[in-house]
Amino acid sequence: MARAALASIPTGEHSLRTGEFTYGLLIEAGMSPREASLAMDRLTLYLVGDAYEASVHWARMRAAGMRDPREYFEAFIRQITTYYRALPRERFPHLYDHVDDLTADGGEARFEYGLELLLDGIEAAHAQDLTRPALGRIA
């Protein structure tokens, strides 16, 4: 489902209602229609991209004959950690030295962090847009 949402314009009833609601919230928050359209587009892409990645993991889990998501993700993280620790440190010092930080948080924490980062950026850009002269604004 997430894959189908990529590179398409929402035309289904549910997608249209969700888009209308989100777009309305952004406009009511004081964004210009153009700015709100860009923000909504980026938020939607973030959500759909995350859903698509999750669907890829579920497919891999099933293909591996696993039923427990925790077991799958622990094995997935072990595989990444083992690979990064085998990299030549002189070529990849940051990945090698910080592999535990790179793999520390689970999908939910990463999703929440990314969403907050995106929302904070939209809020900051909107606040900055309000202080720019009309020619510098997204119209």
Language-model region placement:
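Amphipathic alpha-helical packing segments from all-alpha helical-bundle domains
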Residues: 6-30, 34-41, 81-93
